[in-house]
């Protein structure tokens, strides 16, 4: 067996205070886009005990009840009393929202006068997309498992299987890999860590037994578990106080959980609460589609794509591709295929990925359990684009 290494990814579920904020920001975005697809939205949320504040810059024709969106989102997650960390119906809701800066508006969309191909990037920045053939989702296994454990925790809380669960929770998975000429091959799960909020009545033994039976078993394939797999289940011993009561929350603080679990790279820009002129979001979505399409087409087993922008300029400043030595043809040729197959101008990304369409909780769904590797028609950037290349050529 080749030499192996350990790699760890974490996730948090929808009751984590930072994720609560992401979901509120994206629920606001959904509401704006549903009524006015040209809404310009930069919506931040913060929360602490008994308080949620929504603030930012929004220019929209939509009639939006911000307070109702906040309360509905908190309630749907399960924050229905102070005991669980926040009472959706009685907490304070503060709103401080202004219009988009006219300086930004004229530079990016010319106060709504520019054609789609002329729309400039809403800011400077660089974004990365990543894909790997180690899972059917073409996502890193460590990230997929951590994310699915978090989603499963919420599922068994909401369906009553584990009635002692409360909304807040974190997961972390360490996977043993070996490197097969640049491709990542998972061997086994080394460690599983779950810290979940719980009520006063349950014992630590019950927590451990229920988590193994109802959360870990259904999520982690048996082939990855063995007698050496380590389980840390609520290792702190007590997690009754959670949600915004336990920690303050803020939009945009879980950007690695939202993307690739520490694999690939990250340009630093968060996603939630941003309309598609914000390339932090739309740029990251299009390069995920590019990287995924490269791997799905057999051009490479693993791939990262970077794009960069200047504020007000439609064309990207740079596009970069690296296949970690797994490419069937040289990376510079793959880069050429990417440039011919994908339009990186923000206005065209919006059209090609249908990113101006709100409603149906479209962006709210992205705000918990990851933006990538999801099987949902609303996640248009996960659709593989056929790439034309001569696959008889071997590197």
Swiss-Prot record:
Class of the enzyme per the UniProt entry, highest EC level: transferase
Cofactor annotation remark: Binds 2 divalent ions per subunit. The metal ions interact primarily with the substrate. Can utilize magnesium, manganese or cobalt (in vitro). Binds 1 potassium ion per subunit. The potassium ion interacts primarily with the substrate.
Residue sites binding L-methionine per the record: 57, 100, 247, 278
E.C. no: 2.5.1.6
Superkingdom to which the source organism belongs: Eukaryota
Catalytic reactions on record: L-methionine + ATP + H2O = S-adenosyl-L-methionine + phosphate + diphosphate
GO MF terms, alphabetically ordered: ATP binding; metal ion binding; methionine adenosyltransferase activity
Statement: the UniProt record of this protein carries the keyword Coiled coil: no
GO cellular component: cytosol
Residues the record lists as binding K(+): 44
Main location: cytoplasm
Function field: Catalyzes the formation of S-adenosylmethionine from methionine and ATP. The reaction comprises two steps that are both catalyzed by the same enzyme: formation of S-adenosylmethionine (AdoMet) and triphosphate, and subsequent hydrolysis of the triphosphate.
Subunit structure, interactors included: Homotetramer.
Name this polypeptide is given: S-adenosylmethionine synthase 3
Gene that this sequence comes from: METK3
